[in-house]
Amino acid sequence: EINIGDWSSDVCSSDLQDPTAYGEDWGKPGSICELLDKLNKVPGLEWIRIMYAYPERITDDFIAAMKRNEKVVPYLDLPIQHCNDTILKNMNRRSNRAELLEVIGKLRREIPGITLRTTLIAGFPGETEEQFEDLCNFVKEVKFDRLGCFAYSAEENTVAAKMDGQIDQETKDRRAELVMQIQTGIMAQKQAEKVGQTVHVLCDGIDEESGLYLCRTTGDAPEVDGNVCVSSEEPLYPGQFYDVLVEDSDLYDLYGTVVK
C-alpha cells in the first residue's frame, strides 16, 4: 500500500505476493531493501505498507530497511498458517516454531510498536488435539495484534486434499472458533489500552449512515483491519492525515475526535 496525498494504491501485484522476494526473479534477492530506500525519497509519499512477508525471508537487512525509512509503516502480515513443526512440514512451510518465535521477537525488539497480523488454519489433515493445543498456546504466547483463523478447506487436486487424516467439518469449525475466542480476548485488551492515546490517522472517507469519518492508523491495513471512527464538526478529507484522541473502542474499531 502506498499513500501519496489523496491517492492510495495497493502496489502488491499478483506476481509479488511476497514483497520480500522482490528481485529474486532477476537474480538480486534482497532488492526490497533498495526499493524501500528509493520509495522513501519520493516527494509527497506518506506511507509505505508492506502487506505480506514470509518469516523465512525476514532478514536483518530487511528489518534495518524498515527501521531507517520513516515512511515505511511499522506493520507486517506474516502468513504463518500454523506453529506446530509437524503440521508446518506437512504444509510444506519453510519455518518451524522456534524460528517463528525468533523472528517475531526480533521484529518487536527492533521495531517497537510494530503491528503484527497473521492468518492461521485449524483442522489441517492429520492435526491432532495435541497439535491443535500447541496452536492455541502459541496464539496466547505471541498475542498477535491482528489474527484470523479459518477452518481448513480442501481444494481439488492439491496434495493436502489427498492426505490421510482428513478431519470432519464440525471439528474443524470448532477448532477455528476456539482460536478466534482466544484472539478475541487478546484484541479486546489491546484495543482498550489505546483509549486515551492520540493516534495519527489517514482519512479514507465518511460513513454516510453514521456520519463518522473512517480513518486508519499505521496499524490498520485497508479492507482487512479496523477503522478509527472519527466525529468532527469540521470536514475531513480523504487522503489527508489527522491526529485523533481515542475516546472509546470495541473489538475492531476505535472511536475518537480530532485533536485541534
Residues covered by each model-derived region:
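Short acidic/polar active-site loop segments enriched in Thr and Asp
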Residues: 9-10, 46, 145, 150, ...
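Short beta-alpha junctions and helix-cap segments that line functional grooves
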Residues: 62-63, 135, 230-231
